[in-house]
C-alpha cells in the first residue's frame, strides 16, 4: 500500500513557506506567535 506522506520540497514551501505566511494578515500572526514562543523554525 502506498503511504500518504510522500515528501516534496516545492509543494511544501508553496503552501507553508515563510513568504506565503507573510502574504496574509493571519499568516503574519502565525509567524509572530512562533517568534514570541521562541520557535527555532518560524516556517517550514
From Swiss-Prot:
Membrane-crossing ranges are none
A molecular function (GO) term: structural constituent of ribosome
Q: Which GO terms describe its biological process?
A: translation
Cross-referenced Pfam families, in alphabetical order? Ribosomal_L34 (PF00468)
Q: Which GO terms describe its cellular component?
A: ribonucleoprotein complex; ribosome
Which terms are listed as keywords in the entry?
Answer: Ribonucleoprotein, Ribosomal protein
Family the UniProt entry places it in? Belongs to the bacterial ribosomal protein bL34 family.
This one is known as Large ribosomal subunit protein bL34
Q: Which organism is it from?
A: Campylobacter jejuni subsp. jejuni serotype O:2 (strain ATCC 700819 / NCTC 11168)
Amino acid at each position: 500500500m502506498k503511504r500518504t506522506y510522500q515528501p516534496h520540497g516545492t509543494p511544501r514551501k508553496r503552501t507553508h513557506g515563510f513568504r506565503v505566511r507573510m502574504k496574509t494578515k493571519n499568516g503574519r500572526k502565525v509567524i509572530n506567535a512562533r517568534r514570541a514562543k521562541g520557535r527555532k523554525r518560524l516556517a517550514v
